[in-house]
Design a protein with these regions (language model features):
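Metallocofactor- and cofactor-centric catalytic cores in central/energy metabolism, strongly enriched
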Residues: 1-121, 135, 143-147, 154-156, ...
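A general structural motif
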Residues: 105-107, 159-163, 182-188
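Pore-lining transmembrane helices
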Residues: 137-142, 245
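A conserved active-site cap/scaffold subdomain adjacent to cofactor or substrate pockets
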Residues: 156, 170-236
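Short, conserved secondary-structure transition motifs
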Residues: 159-167, 241-244
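Internal helical hairpin/lid segments
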Residues: 212-303
Length: 348
């Protein structure tokens, strides 16, 4: 807890001490928030009766085993798959992708296209995961793809839309408030998160900004302001969001049903390329309909992602599941709740 005013924030937050019978449950839905909360031990500053739980905010974690097995199937067909490095460690039904041939790690969607352009004889797929910021980058990339029309490049999309999942969690889980993702909101805008029925605050990522956001949420909860929505990250987020990025997304992508780890199939929660761009849609080029996958029944990552289970309560945590040898996605990705809890747990 190496930041100023920690004791001041403890005092301010303690004004909203709650009895066990009136537990206040706040969910953070951003992997960067999860990491910061664990790093700075912010949970230790919360008053009695207030619980901060992690939600489905890690983009790599929420992609299920089926997505990994689709990548593996493409590799078996001699396709080169470009992907973000975190995906290498996410377990599928047949284990992780570590050691597989024809994989290329990229750091942006643009890197994937550049590889394809430099290797015109190589069938290249970009295994795409992420929320609105990465989706916006991919949409900008598609403008270049539309112009150049490379015949060896396609996108296997598992881009996610967070709102349908938040709506589901707000209906089914006993949540008192949401710490909303600043990076996503920089694209979608504040207004994208209206109508959830519980208080929400868009937050930045510094510890004091997170604590201030939590203070706003607790104050709103005690005042009964269920529809409160506050932008506490005004340097990066506007009410209308990034209009240019939204237009690009709408031009190239459309939402459809998508599978989320721990939540199953959620309507309108996965973005895929629109029909006019089917020539660059991996699932329209290659037959992946027969690919099947099973999640590891011992891994409880799905419960962690939906706030039903704290990482330390999983029987695999820290024993057979560690960052060096992860049994599940939440431990494999640095943005995962389990990985953050393990790295910054007491004694480490």
């Amino acid at each position: 807890m190496d930041f100023k005013n920690a004791q001041l924030w403890r005092t301010l937050l303690d004004e909203y001490n709650s009895s066990a019978a009136q537990e206040i449950r706040v969910m953070e839905v951003c992997g960067t928030h999860t990491h910061a909360i664990a790093r700075y031990a912010l949970r230790t500053l919360l008053p009695e009766g207030v619980t901060l739980i992690s939600g489905p905010g890690c983009p790599v974690c929420v992609s299920g085993a089926l997505f990994i097995e689709k990548i593996r199937h493409l590799l078996r067909q001699g396709v080169t798959v470009t992907l973000f490095g975190d995906l290498l460690r996410i377990p599928g039904t047949s284990g992780t992708l570590m050691g597989e041939r024809n994989l290329r790690i990229v750091y942006s969607p643009a890197d994937a296209l550049h590889f394809a352009l430099e290797n015109p004889g190589v069938k290249t797929v970009f295994a795409a995961v992420g929320f609105a910021p990465t989706l916006a980058a991919a949409a900008a990339l598609m403008a270049e793809v539309e112009e150049l029309r490379p015949r060896n490049f396609s996108i296997l999309s598992d881009f996610k839309e967070i709102m349908p999942v938040l709506q589901l969690l707000c209906r089914e889980e006993k949540l008192s408030g949401l710490l909303l993702p600043g990076h996503v909101a920089s694209i979608t805008g504040l207004r994208h998160f209206r109508g959830l029925g519980i208080p929400g605050v868009i937050s930045g990522f510094e510890p004091e900004n997170i604590l201030h956001s939590l203070h706003i949420l607790l104050k709103a909860h005690h005042a009964g302001k269920k529809d409160l929505l506050v932008n506490n990250y005004p340097d990066a987020v506007r009410d209308e969001g990034n209009i240019q990025a939204q237009k690009l997304i709408d031009r190239y992508f459309s939402p459809e049903n998508g599978t989320w780890r721990g939540l199953g199939n959620i309507p309108q929660s996965r973005y895929t390329l629109k029909e006019p761009y089917a020539a660059f849609d991996t699932e329209k080029i290659f037959d992946l309909s027969q690919v099947q996958a099973l999640e590891n029944p011992a891994c409880r990552c799905g419960e962690v992602l939906t706030g039903k289970l704290q990482p330390e309560s999983c029987p695999l945590f820290g024993t057979v599941c560690t960052p060096e040898e992860p049994a599940g996605a939440c431990m494999a990705s640095p943005e995962g709740s389990c990985a953050a809890s393990f790295k910054f747990r007491e004694g480490n």
